[in-house]
């Protein structure tokens, strides 16, 4: 059975930070944020397994949990799928929860916080900022557009 490789950066600081936040989180929002972040990463992991047929290496740090892409070369299209998988999971879960609450289940405190936190995690990760999924998505789209323009530039449109 394949093994999951997890690298923890600054384990003492990470443990202290999480322990402190969990101790003062009387509303449960931090626990819900951790759940939504883990679900986000599960989206990336599922697509990585589908593309590469192996488990990815993971890194945990104060910035969060992320896939380690060291030594993994993907085409821009495959990297686009991988980068979009995490936010897609969050947005899908938020939409599903809102649709479920709009039906027979009715609105609940947990449901609203779960949907809101998923929207926040998914939306935040779509920002085109270095280190986030949005940056990788924008880079992949740029590469795909440049490739498409390069391929069609040999044929004049006149």
Feature locations, PLM:
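Hydrophobic transmembrane alpha-helices and their immediate loop junctions
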Residues: 1-158
